Amino acid sequence: MTSNETTAGALLPPLSCYASLVPYYDAGGITIYHGDSRKILPMLGRFDLLMTDPPYGIGFAAQPTTGGRKRGQKKEQWDDEAIEEWVLHQAMARADKRVIWGGNYYNLPAARCILSWYKPDAPPSMGNVEYAWTNLDQNSRQISRSIAATNPERLGHPTQKPLHVISWAIQQAGEAQTILDPLAGSGTTGHAAKNFGKRCVMIEREERYCEIAARRLAQEVLPFSSHNTKLSDSPSCSDQR
């Protein structure tokens, strides 16, 4: 197996293909590009897994969640415009397996497998379940984790997921070794990928979040343990969006 080939069979292009891209951070198999995903994505090759958490519903009128509550946050400069579905579809075309948190807000195909994060201690102002659209060929899965217990590190990004939740979601993709996140935020995907020893390319257009992500990645790798995670199988969700 060559250095660019992954166990899942996807092939990343040689590093020379990225010659015109200057990374903000590049160490230990994790790369951050500071810029617009619409310009950077066409320059990238294929990946085993797309794992991303778009800032859906941020800076807009609050939108109803599946549970009837509304998701709305203070408008941020990085989200002056709606996140274009073009970015998601371009990223999807570059990955064999795809996990998109908040995918129910976008025009995506029906999914057999929905990943969900149940938050038993969620405040009344926010929904107690968040969903991820996937193309995974397996039954839907749910993780039940307290917000306070799993997210002691709040880094200022409105849609930041707990590291443990993103780590669990990556595990659902099996042997994926190369990961793409075109809407990286504070870099939780890269942090989880580093802990697993996987290669990850992230894109983020706000430099302050690139700085936060780079600082997190410079810290010592902490082993991820799955034995404290409560998992449950739920019925097939082929009719869900």
Where would I find each of the regions flagged by the language model?
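Class I S-adenosyl-L-methionine-dependent methyltransferase catalytic core
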Residues: M1-L180, S186-R241
